[in-house]
Amino acid sequence: TTLGRGGSDFTAALLAEALDAESCEIWTDVTGVYTTDPRITPAAHPLPELSFEEAAEMATFGAKVLHPATMEPALRKDIKVFVGSSKEPEKGGTWIVRDCEHEPPYRAITRRKEQVMVTVKTPKMMYAQGFLQQVFAIIAKHKLSVDLVTTSEISVSFTLDNPANSVAQRLNKETIAELETICDVKVEKGYDLVTVVGNNMQTAIGVSSKILSAVSDFNLRMICFGANPHNLSFLVNETDSD
């Protein structure tokens, strides 16, 4: 297809939706959706079952086994999705379904490389109305897509995905100059975005403390947890993400 990597997955899900299919099977070169990248972590293993939301979060935040949009048509028609290996079909795979709860609540880890962190800062933000709207209007004008966002009294930090320096090409002097008409701007590169994906992570006691204590030896930036019950994300220096 013309949809890029994983586009055939999305096409299959759209066809399943159009045909009112009960299930959609996606055959790849891996035996299901893994807990993390097995090339980095030998202990990684396929998950027997995932919810639509968990799979969508994993695809969005770096898991390459599925196209991020694949879950949309499946979710609309409640179509079960199976992911397995065409080379080793006897090994089974992962079923992706509407409702799925497993222990522990954190179930997988993804990584998205080449992230850019932008921090905009001005004392005027404390009392000004519409400041964020101005900032994100400039970002949208230059066709930049924001992922994580954190705020303080006088500053806002946000991340931009930067595959093959595509963001660097658009986050140019013109963009920064326009932002600097309303605030100070700091651009930092060399980060990877790590996301822990699971279910009911907001309500499970001690989940965030366990995750953060496991990475306490590393300098984390932009810890984001709470907007979605299925993930906790943070930036880490690209030299530490493995």
Residue ranges and their predicted role:
Residues 1-242:
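C-terminal catalytic "cap/lid" subdomain
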